[in-house]
Swiss-Prot record:
NAD(+) binds at residues 10-34. It comes from Bacillus subtilis (strain 168). One of its GO terms (molecular function) is oxidoreductase activity. Coiled coil: none annotated. InterPro entries: NAD(P)-bd_dom_sf, Sc_DH/Rdtase_CS, SDR_fam. The gene is yxbG. This is Uncharacterized oxidoreductase YxbG.
Amino acid sequence: MGRLENKTAVITGAATGIGQATAEVFANEGARVIIGDINKDQMEETVDAIRKNGGQAESFHLDVSDENSVKAFADQIKDACGTIDILFNNAGVDQEGGKVHEYPVDLFDRIIAVDLRGTFLCSKYLIPLMLENGGSIINTSSMSGRAADLDRSGYNAAKGGITNLTKAMAIDYARNGIRVNSISPGTIETPLIDKLAGTKEQEMGEQFREANKWITPLGRLGQPKEMATVALFLASDDSSYVTGEDITADGGIMAYTWPGKMLIEEKWKEETK
């Protein structure tokens, strides 16, 4: 029997990357998976893959930055399922924009709208479907919410906000039997990384990945399924006494005092396979 047998799980941003991997893992563990994403074609591919593997999945269009879209999404889920047990707020965007005085206001607003406000909106309209039976909410934050990156003030602000919003929600809903936690991934091999840094086949992308091998104590980028299994822990009864927490899954980057030292330390380079 799977760890999520007879549970209904809603996952946003599940067309690709961490969300897609989590949808597949949850379905394999017995959950009925409801996927929401702005990318209809890729979202349907995720649903088809789950069904071909014997799982239960369905999808509804969702733009987390649009309140009316979120309301409609929640209404569709209520009509289809009545209640839900798990909400994984995973939808997000990222883009460099320069230093704060150079940073485009519309880019800052866009990242806040999708990443932070989107997490708030989906929680606001889907939590009512959890109040009767309780459950688990998981929010995707980032190691960038704990420590800042150059030229990414919008993303840093959004993810830092998600980490603290998670704590606020955990306090608000603990007595309703709803646990709320966040995951802070490190650098994960997803289409978002391809967009930000280049693909493995491109020189820029290859250099980025090589640098991350040095910076990351475990010596590699993470894989989407490794984040999905963290989400599975938080969604399941295995974490029944865990709420208000942020789990950092970054290969050890945040444990190091000065990760930049790894780029110039010859001994570390020699030990990096």
